UniProtKB/Swiss-Prot annotation:
It catalyses: prephenate + S-adenosyl-L-methionine = carboxy-S-adenosyl-L-methionine + 3-phenylpyruvate + H2O. The keyword S-adenosyl-L-methionine applies. GO terms for biological process: tRNA wobble uridine modification. Belongs to the class I-like SAM-binding methyltransferase superfamily. Cx-SAM synthase family. Keywords: S-adenosyl-L-methionine, Transferase. The keyword Transferase applies. Catalyzes the conversion of S-adenosyl-L-methionine (SAM) to carboxy-S-adenosyl-L-methionine (Cx-SAM). It comes from Psychrobacter arcticus (strain DSM 17307 / VKM B-2377 / 273-4). This is Carboxy-S-adenosyl-L-methionine synthase.
Length: 262
């Protein structure tokens, strides 16, 4: 298995220097062309465990994608949604481990800058695979029946009031035996634990070359844009929408990944 992070690289990957100079405190983080240009570097240096989460997706898919849906050519294929796909890293990781006729992937992101680059990367690397890149708000998607939904670092950018409705639609679309993989940044219920986790996360970023100005600048830009939940809140919400079984399979500091079973 090739390393998943090595596949999702634009032709020229820039070093993340977005917050090396002071910014207007009112400036909000957005997934624009500037972010796209340095996104792989940003993810590598600021999301602990992201590569490990990606690497497990094909392993999960082999257990839970049963090739139930009929393709146009009569072959049985399995449909997977990659929601908040950014540059398509999850989709490419799956495509790299499955034959082109086995999967139909719908990769969706609200950012035109992201989907434009993702389309190029996916078509260049996996031209034979059935991967559709869609520019849309996942809240507006009418999901088709599917075996697997990937929601990596995406729910946290939705208004809290909209999260249940999205998960309800995902649950309804999943086939029996299908799964949702939900990866999120979280905060701890206990303030002391949370403070420790946050500071260790900043240590992680410092160890990866980020300066105090960069750490502070991004924190300010993400305020009221990225809204975290506690791990318990995630599990409670999953149960609320109908998932009877769901477990935290991965945690690295305040980043967690949950698998929920239909």
């Amino acid at each position: 298995m090739s390393h998943p992070m090595s596949q999702s690289q634009p032709a020229t990957v820039k070093h993340d220097t977005l917050f090396t100079t002071p910014l207007d405190k009112a400036a909000r983080f957005s997934f624009d062309e500037q972010v796209v240009a340095c996104f792989p570097d940003m993810i590598r240096r600021s999301v602990p465990g992201y590569g490990q989460v990606l690497a497990m997706l094909p392993i999960f898919a082999r257990r839970h994608c049963k090739y139930r849906q009929q393709g146009d050519n009569g072959q049985r294929v399995s449909r997977i949604y990659d929601l908040g796909c950014s540059l398509g890293a999850a989709s490419m990781t799956l495509a790299g481990e499955f034959e082109s006729q086995d999967l139909q992937i719908k990769a969706i992101d609200i950012s035109p800058a992201m989907t434009t680059e993702a389309t190029t990367l996916l078509s260049d690397n996996y031209p034979e695979h059935d991967i559709e890149v869609i520019t849309a708000d996942i809240r507006d998607i009418e999901f088709e029946p599917c075996d697997m939904v990937i929601l990596n670092l995406t729910l946290q950018f939705l208004p809290a009031a909209d999260r249940v409705a999205v998960l309800e639609k995902i649950y309804a679309a999943l086939s029996e035996g299908g799964i949702l993989v939900l990866t999120e940044k979280t905060h701890a219920f206990d303030e002391q634990y949370d403070a420790w986790l946050v500071e260790r996360y900043y240590d992680f970023k410092r160890a990866n070359g980020y300066t105090e100005m960069e750490i502070s600048g991004k924190r300010n830009a993400l305020e009221n844009v990225l809204i975290t939940d506690t791990l318990d809140e995630h599990h409670t919400r999953l149960a609320q929408v109908g998932f009877q079984r769901h477990l935290t399979w991965f945690q690295f500091l305040n980043f967690v990944s949950i698998v929920a079973f239909k």
